[in-house]
């Protein structure tokens, strides 16, 4: 969508109602000029905002999270799983996908169809544990007395399941937990992966193997590190 802006979730969560209203108004105007049936989003926060908060502003849409679409396409045969992965993974329920909107089964079904054995953490579904980024916290400075980040606590919980893969279905979760495995010293024990990566690998699509993903990420971190050293 041309001229797409943030849906406004983070603005509203930190109390910027005026900014949220402005973003919603702009997006609704833009969407009025688009020909579509559904809005697809990879972000549970955006999903919740568009589905539950835009209607009061005049924006009523059919909104889907990508995990639901993936499940539907797999069940219909439009996505063909040709190489089951045969790995062990756990799944983190995003707050705004699970507790707020009741989408628990679709991501788990996608994992199952891709050949991922699901090992549940004790805190799952409605009792899931926040990654620590919600409510605008991702933009705030951490408290200096904090002994352990919520995301690090969650990684430790995941390790107890015996899983090697930590599955996410939210971009904030990917950021928080990718960082947490490093800061907690668990890079060699747990790999954080997005749900769609399983589908791509199980479909044997190129450019989505875990080795290539890790190599790309490593190169990205190297470039950032080199840049910061040059600035210093």
Regions flagged by a language model, labelled:
Residues 1-232:
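Iron-sulfur cluster-binding electron-transfer modules in prokaryotic oxidoreductases
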């Amino acid at each position: 969508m041309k001229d797409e802006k943030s849906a406004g979730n983070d603005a509203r969560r930190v109390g910027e109602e005026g900014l949220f209203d402005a973003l919603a108004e702009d997006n609704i105007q833009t969407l009025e000029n688009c020909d579509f049936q559904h809005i697809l989003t990879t972000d549970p926060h955006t999903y919740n905002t568009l589905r539950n908060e835009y209607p009061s502003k005049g924006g009523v849409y059919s909104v889907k999270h990508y995990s639901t679409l993936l499940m539907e396409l797999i069940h219909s045969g439009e996505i063909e799983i040709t190489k089951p992965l045969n790995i062990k993974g756990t799944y983190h329920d995003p707050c705004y996908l699970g507790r707020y909107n009741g989408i628990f089964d679709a991501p788990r079904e996608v994992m199952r169809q891709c050949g991922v054995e699901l090992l549940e953490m004790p805190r799952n579904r409605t009792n899931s544990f926040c990654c620590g980024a919600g409510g605008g916290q991702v933009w705030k400075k951490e408290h200096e007395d904090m002994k352990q980040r919520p995301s690090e606590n969650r990684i430790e919980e995941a390790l107890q399941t015996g899983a090697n893969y930590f599955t996410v279905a939210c971009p904030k979760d990917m950021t928080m937990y990718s960082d947490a495995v490093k800061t907690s010293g668990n890079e060699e024990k747990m790999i954080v992966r997005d749900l769609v990566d399983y589908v791509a690998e199980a479909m044997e699509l190129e450019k989505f193997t875990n080795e290539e993903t890790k190599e790309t990420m490593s190169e990205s971190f190297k470039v950032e590190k080199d840049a910061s050293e040059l600035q210093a």
